[in-house]
Amino acid sequence: MFLIQCLISAVIFYIQVTNALIFKGDHVSLQVNSSLTSILIPMQNDNYTEIKGQLVFIGEQLPTGTNYSGTLELLYADTVAFCFRSVQVIRYDGCPRIRTSAFISCRYKHSWHYGNSTDRISTEPDAGVMLKITKPGINDAGVYVLLVRLDHSRSTDGFILGVNVYTAGSHHNIHGVIYTSPSLQNGYSTRALFQQARLCDLPATPKGSGTSLFQHMLDLRAGKSLEDNPWLHEDVVTTETKSVVKEGIENHVYPTDMSTLPEKSLNDPPENLLIIIPIVASVMILTAMVIVIVISVKRRRIKKHPIYRPNTKTRRGIQNATPESDVMLEAAIAQLATIREESPPHSVVNPFVK
């Protein structure tokens, strides 16, 4: 059963990534159609831009348990100073292992934005949106880093997304506008960006906080409570029992309290068995019913059309008659005649006749 599941996952994954870019991390990978988007402002039609994709598991990255949890953090570095600014943090808990997709149909989702950031910029991997910018401006150009940390892993995977913003200049080309690009974005690795950010000025550590903002960005501990972080404010999109979001379908959200998150016991039966066992039992019951019906129909047809079998014993007795039996019969008849001759019938005396 496990081999069949792996084969199906591989086929589905191959179909999904045929026309996509894959950035493989240590514990999870990123699948996007493009890691860079360009915006022309002012925008004519749509009032937002986004990079679509999803987080996936490749090969040995697939979690071994039935459920997993993790934390995502979206960072932003502008194209001038390359100072990191944490934008959003998302916490996923109770995520089932469904094929190769990561963080879909999770039982709990909790999202926060930093106080010094804007809600216009966000990420929602469970909805297939890796980066979304509403009402983009020239200051939104730069490099965005998505940090992903699974609870069962010891390191954080980082994926880079780029945004170019162009403005209409005073000179016009044949189409009526000329595009002016901000500073060029060369290929920056996650490690290089981190090293650059260490030289930037960081905000002062709030009172009562044991770590700085930058240390918090680089140290995403799975067991660390994000609700008490002084830089975070909770988003409205915090949900419970969140299902897979599809484009064009309105999703309802419900607030939840992560303190009431139940712990999963190791003795609990796997969720796959809870699905497979009823299916197998139903198939066996249906098969047994079909067999019983077939046997009943066959018996009824046999009773309606019985097979005639002659009594061969009587015929054999008649055919096997020998001349000896005829001789004995004749002797008995002769003896009976002799007895009648020797003993004539008695005369009947009528008492009324003298």
UniProtKB/Swiss-Prot annotation:
Interacts with gE; this interaction enhances the Fc receptor function of gE. It is found in: Virion membrane; Host cell membrane; Host cell junction; Host Golgi apparatus membrane. Residues 18-295 are virion surface. Residues 313-354 are intravirion. In epithelial cells, the heterodimer gE/gI is required for the cell-to-cell spread of the virus, by sorting nascent virions to cell junctions. Once the virus reaches the cell junctions, virus particles can spread to adjacent cells extremely rapidly through interactions with cellular receptors that accumulate at these junctions. Implicated in basolateral spread in polarized cells. In neuronal cells, gE/gI is essential for the anterograde spread of the infection throughout the host nervous system. InterPro entries: Herpes_gI. Keywords: Glycoprotein, Host cell junction, Host cell membrane, Host Golgi apparatus, Host membrane, Host-virus interaction, Membrane, Phosphoprotein, Signal, Transmembrane, Transmembrane helix, Viral envelope protein, Viral immunoevasion, Virion. The gene is gI. This is Envelope glycoprotein I. The lineage of its organism: Viruses, Duplodnaviria, Heunggongvirae, Peploviricota, Herviviricetes. GO terms for cellular component: host cell; host cell Golgi membrane; host cell junction; membrane; viral envelope; virion membrane. It comes from Varicella-zoster virus (strain Dumas) (HHV-3). Its main location: virion.
